[in-house]
């Protein structure tokens, strides 16, 4: 059970919400603020004075006054008309994050929503009744309207859900959770729809996956150093302290620890090779830069996870209703775009190491890591697959945040595209996962070929894990299943756990 304290969510809590079957409860300390916000809205609605989102239309129709007897219909119509998403359903882990983030935002008491509505969301979450939310349809301002409308429609008994993973109607989902359809009151539909929770949830969910891939890449890169008989001197702490970037310093320390005590490395200490190619030698510099970007993105996304991104905002102490632009997800878009750059570079560097290993001139290993080259092609086309995926990532890493299209008759004339920026991270991460799987296989093959010498004590379990699933590549065979099984292990964090490093979300 995780207690949600609005405005005080942590990255470890968010990772658990995405990855573990935890349940939620709202911190009772938030109840007074929530109730005060709801009362403030009720008082404004009763007076009948125009206030955006409470008794007016929306977007370009903000100047249209809505009579008191139509306020409930206004909120219902808002939810139903905005539920226009398309595409595949959002991943379960992202939906769980989305719901938790929405609860945190509402729970700060500046949205004017009743606790009854929040309790219904928590009940659905804890019953494992998750809204079916199409993943496409948001431009990231005014908030993530379409995705959040699909979440909200379920509270009205409209739309679809997943009941413990099985697709069903919203009414069936409410029944399983022991709920009845709600009637939303003034401002509540808008409070549910307005916000950056979809883009932030997608960005966080994919960030956690990319963090795991980063740690796996440290392990794969270190194993490739041994496979290529590379030097550990470029990882000397003194080099990296002189430059000063913390990510680089931390990455170099990881490589030193992973490769410490390697018999392969000790076997060629006195060789006449002066410098390794950049894909081996400059790993701390490249991976360190990725790490710095990822840490910054995590900081931004944590702030956004705890933010109130509704509009308008209710200030119960003064009774004011202030319209602003906290729904604009530009910070999320930038963070997601930076994560895309980092994830693509992790894959690009791994692809270069694969290319090095299969090149006999550079690695000193048999061509394409197989005996009887010619009749056997070995890792030749596995590298082509890695190259294809790395190239695809370069296109996917193009920043989404530089694009904008005006909407709502030019009332909403600049948007963030944060949801697309966050959503495409999943494709980049999947490509990088498979590149790393190919590198792990190639590096393990190279280490085998260095016999009788072995890799380091830290990397020995990695070899055991790989060889426990995939045998040494003796002769050409149907290769795709080998890649698939190692990619599955990468996704399960089997190799990430070996890295002597952890992110803030894992602590």
Swiss-Prot record:
A Pfam family: Lyase_aromatic
A GO term for molecular function: histidine ammonia-lyase activity
Superkingdom per UniProt: Bacteria
UniProt modified residues of type 2,3-didehydroalanine (Ser): 142
Cross-link (5-imidazolinone (Ala-Gly)), chain numbering: 141-143
Record EC number: 4.3.1.3
Main location: cytoplasm
Post-translational modification: Contains an active site 4-methylidene-imidazol-5-one (MIO), which is formed autocatalytically by cyclization and dehydration of residues Ala-Ser-Gly.
The keyword Cytoplasm is assigned to this record: yes
CDD domains xref list: PAL-HAL
GO cellular component term, pick one: cytoplasm
Gene Ontology terms: biological process: L-histidine catabolic process to glutamate and formamide; L-histidine catabolic process to glutamate and formate
Keywords (A to Z) from UniProt: Cytoplasm, Histidine metabolism, Lyase
InterPro entries: Aromatic_Lyase, Fumarase/histidase_N, HutH, L-Aspartase-like, Phe/His_NH3-lyase_AS
Family recorded in the similarity comment: Belongs to the PAL/histidase family.
UniProt protein name: Histidine ammonia-lyase
Species of provenance: Burkholderia orbicola (strain MC0-3)
Lineage of the organism: Bacteria, Pseudomonadati, Pseudomonadota, Betaproteobacteria, Burkholderiales
Underlying gene: hutH
């Amino acid at each position: 059970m995780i207690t949600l304290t609005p405005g005080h969510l942590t990255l470890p809590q968010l990772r658990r919400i995405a990855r573990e079957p935890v349940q939620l409860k709202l911190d009772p300390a938030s109840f007074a603020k929530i109730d005060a916000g709801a009362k403030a809205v009720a008082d404004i609605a009763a007076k009948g004075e125009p206030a955006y989102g409470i008794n007016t239309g929306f977007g370009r129709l903000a100047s249209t006054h809505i009579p008191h007897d139509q306020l409930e219909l206004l909120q219902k119509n808002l939810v139903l008309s905005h539920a226009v998403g398309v595409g595949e359903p959002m991943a379960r882990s992202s939906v769980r994050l989305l719901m938790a983030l929405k609860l945190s935002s509402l729970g700060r008491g500046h949205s004017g929503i009743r606790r009854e509505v929040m309790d219904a969301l928590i009940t659905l979450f804890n019953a494992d009744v998750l809204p079916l939310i199409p993943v496409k349809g948001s431009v990231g301002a005014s908030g993530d309207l379409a995705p959040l409308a699909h979440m909200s429609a379920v509270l009205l008994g409209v739309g679809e859900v997943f009941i413990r993973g099985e697709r069903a109607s919203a009414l069936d989902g409410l029944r399983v959770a022991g709920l009845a359809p709600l009637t939303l009151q003034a401002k509540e539909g808008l409070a549910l729809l307005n916000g950056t929770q979809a883009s932030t949830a997608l960005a966080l969910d994919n960030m956690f996956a990319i963090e795991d891939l980063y740690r796996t890449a440290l392990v794969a890169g270190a194993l490739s150093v041994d496979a290529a008989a590379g030097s550990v001197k470029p990882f000397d702490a003194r080099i990296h302290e002189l430059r000063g970037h913390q990510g680089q310093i931390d990455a170099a320390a990881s490589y030193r620890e992973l490769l410490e005590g390697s018999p392969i490395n000790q076997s060629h200490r006195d060789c006449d090779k002066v410098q390794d190619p950049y894909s081996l030698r400059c790993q701390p510099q490249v991976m360190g830069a990725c790490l710095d970007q990822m840490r910054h993105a995590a900081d931004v996304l944590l702030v956004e996870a705890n933010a109130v991104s509704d509009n308008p905002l209710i200030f119960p102490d003064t009774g004011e209703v202030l319209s602003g632009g906290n729904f604009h997800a530009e910070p999320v878009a930038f963070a997601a775009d930076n994560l895309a750059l980092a994830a693509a570079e992790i894959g690009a560097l791994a692809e270069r190491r694969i290319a090095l290993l299969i090149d006999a001139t550079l690695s000193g290993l048999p061509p394409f890591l197989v005996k009887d080259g010619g009749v056997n092609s070995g890792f030749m086309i596995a590298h082509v697959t890695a190259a294809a995926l790395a190239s695809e990532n370069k296109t996917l890493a193009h920043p989404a945040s530089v694009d904008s299209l005006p909407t709502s008759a030019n009332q909403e004339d600049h948007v963030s595209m944060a949801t697309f920026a966050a959503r495409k991270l999943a494709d980049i991460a999947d490509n990088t996962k498979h590149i790393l799987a190919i590198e792990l296989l190639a590096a393990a093959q190279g280490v085998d070929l260095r016999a009788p010498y072995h890799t380091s004590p830290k990397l020995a379990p990695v070899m055991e894990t790989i060889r426990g699933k995939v045998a040494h590549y003796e002769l050409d065979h149907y290769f795709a299943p080998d890649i698939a099984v190692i990619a599955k292990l990468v996704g399960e964090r089997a190799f990430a756990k070996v890295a002597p490093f952890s992110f803030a979300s894992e602590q």
